[in-house]
Amino acid sequence: MAVMPPPNSVNGSERRYLEDGIWQHGRFYGSWKPGKYLFPIDSEELNRLDIFHKVFLLARDNKPFQAPIQRKAPRMMDIGTGTGIWPINVAEECFTDAQIMAVDLNQILPALIPPGVLPKQYDIEEPTWDSLYTDCDFIHMRMLLGSIQTDLWPQVYRNIFEHLAPGIGHLEHIEVDWTPRCDDDERPANSAFEKWAELFFDGMDRFNRIARVVPQETRQLLEATGFTDVKQEMIRAYVCPWSSDRQEREIARWFNIGLSHSLESLSLKPLVEKLGWKPEDVRKLCTTAKRETCVLRFHTYCNIYVWTARKPGPPQ
């Protein structure tokens, strides 16, 4: 039986998806197929997902996607849609006649959405996607590492391939590499952020849900699936706005906010349930890491990876 937070702690829209949730480690998690999705679905997490939508827009010239779309009324899918901010953005500003299926294990979209956006509760780890759109012009997915069983990634890519339109169907996949990096000596000694990342990756490995970005393996997997025109883009995101470059500073401001929200959300379950940490100790580590990532003299950054690919074949 789900334990609800105090009545005055949630508003009406939140209560719509929290009523069937599970209260664990001080956060709210989805209860449909429990254990499949290891991250919260509470208001703080929804804010985090929307913040990263802004990060990705800033990092990509304010474009929600870059693939060429040939049909005027395209059919699209957003896999792991979260709050639905991406399909809503596309439907309102790019293709008002598009049909966009917003697919997720948890239905946490807002009540008011554009008419072309179709919410779909679905487990993308299923062997086949029989009830999802086919003949798609575009399939979008982002920040799904850690959400998919490690050995099921080839199957997920095969299903995406099968649901794209031959010749004109494109995939775009975006991930954040949470590995802290620094190209100079301006890095903290005994970094709490580095410790957090190592523990997070370890815990997720023990769940058999890899969270590490391995760029070459992803590219090879896309090519092995049958995709052509496979391209990989890497975008640097500093964890605080120290850079003299205006765009880098703006990306860093938003990435810092998103990272601050991510530390606890991502690491609570893996550290508590697989590494034996207490929730309060996880929060202490996250607080220390947050403080570290706000120090301007530290030049730490993370990489954002974007893979794009096309399904070959004559258009039908």
UniProtKB/Swiss-Prot annotation:
Q: Name one GO cellular component term.
A: cytoplasm
Q: What happens when the gene is disrupted?
A: Strongly reduces expression of the transcription factors TRI6 and ZEB2 that control the biosynthesis of the mycotoxins trichothecenes and zearalenon, respectively. Exhibits an earlier induction of sexual fruiting body (perithecia) formation and drastically reduces disease symptoms in wheat.
Which reaction is this enzyme known to catalyze? L-methionyl-[protein] + S-adenosyl-L-methionine = S-methyl-L-methionyl-[protein] + S-adenosyl-L-homocysteine
For molecular function, the Gene Ontology terms on record are: methyltransferase activity
Q: What Gene3D superfamilies has UniProt attached to this entry?
A: Vaccinia Virus protein VP39
Where can this protein be found?
Nucleus; Cytoplasm
The UniProt record describes its induction as: Constitutively expressed under both trichothecenes mycotoxin production and sexual development conditions.
UniProt keywords (A-Z) are: Cytoplasm, Methyltransferase, Nucleus, S-adenosyl-L-methionine, Sporulation, Transcription, Transcription regulation, Transferase, Virulence
Q: Which Pfam families match?
A: Methyltransf_23
Q: Which GO terms describe its biological process?
A: methylation; sporulation resulting in formation of a cellular spore
Q: Any idea of its EC number? A: 2.1.1.-
Q: What start-end ranges are recorded for coiled-coil regions in this protein?
A: none
Kindly report, in one word, the top-level EC class recorded for this enzyme.
transferase
Please explain the role this protein plays, according to its UniProt record.
Methyltransferase that performs automethylation. No other methyl-accepting substrate has been identified yet. Component of the velvet transcription factor complex that acts as a global regulator for secondary metabolite gene expression. Controls the expression of the mycotoxins trichothecenes and zearalenon gene clusters. Negatively controls perithecial induction, but positively controls virulence toward the host plant.
Q: How is this protein organized at the quaternary level? A: Component of the heterotrimeric velvet complex composed of laeA, ve1 and velB; Ve1 acting as a bridging protein between laeA and velB. Interacts directly with veA.
Q: Which family does it belong to?
A: Belongs to the methyltransferase superfamily. LaeA methyltransferase family.
Q: What is this protein called?
A: Secondary metabolism regulator laeA
Originating organism: Gibberella zeae (strain ATCC MYA-4620 / CBS 123657 / FGSC 9075 / NRRL 31084 / PH-1)
